[in-house]
């Protein structure tokens, strides 16, 4: 993936370069980087930022959500990682970590469960080193607090994890863990 990313960045080093490029060229350089819908949204977002914001990328969650393809979690990740602003995230990996950590019961696609998980995410997101925390939470869910074979013995938050304390990490009757 890295060579494809480097090629993409070399061709479109600025938001202005990306905004003025034809979509077919953007898609060509996106080859090898994943979902093409992301490339289309990135292109539309670049055009929006150049046309409406004088090329200044927004930094706060409420403004980032206005960009095509950017939802609350992506906006939070951008705000936290790129701009070091306190902003919660709740991608699939983080949902799994926080649902186990807080023993939140229910399918995360349900509005009430999602609201609970957002509240947990917001409560635990620190004001300092927010970029490190955000990346760590995503990595924790991707590598340790995995869907089917969590590695609780090496988890840095194991001692505070309610599901671990209650021996319910993989209990389908009590927690959603298989997503």
Q: Residues of each region from the PLM?
A:
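Short Gly/Pro-enriched turn/cap motifs at secondary-structure boundaries
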Residues: 178-179
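Catalytic cores of DNA base-excision repair glycosylases
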Residues: 1-153, 157-169, 175
